[in-house]
A protein has these predicted regions:
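Small-residue-biased structural context
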Residues: 1-189
Length: 189
């Protein structure tokens, strides 16, 4: 036989455990929902090359917002740079782990290596811009230099290399690249 005090202790412990489990489930579901929302524009864009082009356009819109800032908008620059870094990092992860790997498998190794090499410079620009004082008069010119690299990289992919890869792949292989790329993007979304 238990005392009233033991019943209260047992019920309190059970209530806390149930509350903790419910909180964990809600947190996990919220994270999955957030990931789905971040990856949805890519999924809805269509095939892998169209999805990557849509991500390119989204990144350029963030560049546009950054270029409209002045040297006094340091908090806004920091926030937008963080958004840009997240968007491009997820994008690069998809390209490097699926698209560039498929390019190598399809005889486009030199081009894939070149694109991957450029991603190293993208990381360098992010480092430099993050380290610079956001009010520094040299910050915006550095951002514009970065945008020039990004736009050149995007044009090379969209106008030349991605069409070459798409043409080398069967419909089934293109479908597989789309699915694999979305899976990789979901990991970082």
């Amino acid at each position: 036989m238990t005392t009233g005090r033991e019943d209260i202790t047992n019920n309190t412990g059970r209530t806390v455990a149930i509350g903790a489990a419910a909180g964990l489930v809600v947190g996990l579901l919220a994270n999955l929902t957030r990931k789905a929302a971040v990856q949805a524009p890519t999924l809805l864009a269509g095939q892998w090359d169209e999805a990557l082009a849509a991500e390119h356009a989204a990144a350029l819109k963030i560049f546009d917002l950054l270029e409209k800032t002045d040297n006094h908008a340091t908090a806004r620059r920091s926030f937008l740079l963080m958004q840009l870094k997240h968007a491009i990092s997820k994008h690069a992860f998809q390209e490097e782990n699926v698209v560039y790997a498929m390019m190598r498998d399809q005889g486009l190794a030199e081009a894939a290596d070149h694109l991957n090499h450029e991603h190293g410079y993208v990381k360098q620009y992010f480092f430099d811009l993050t380290e610079m004082d956001k009010g520094d008069p040299a910050w915006l010119p550095k951002l514009r230099e970065f945008r020039g690299l990004i736009e050149s990289h995007m044009r090379e992919e969209e106008d030349d290399l991605f069409p070459k890869l798409r043409a080398k792949l069967s419909a089934e292989q293109n479908k597989h690249v789309t699915a694999a790329m979305s899976k990789e993007g979901f990991k970082l979304a």
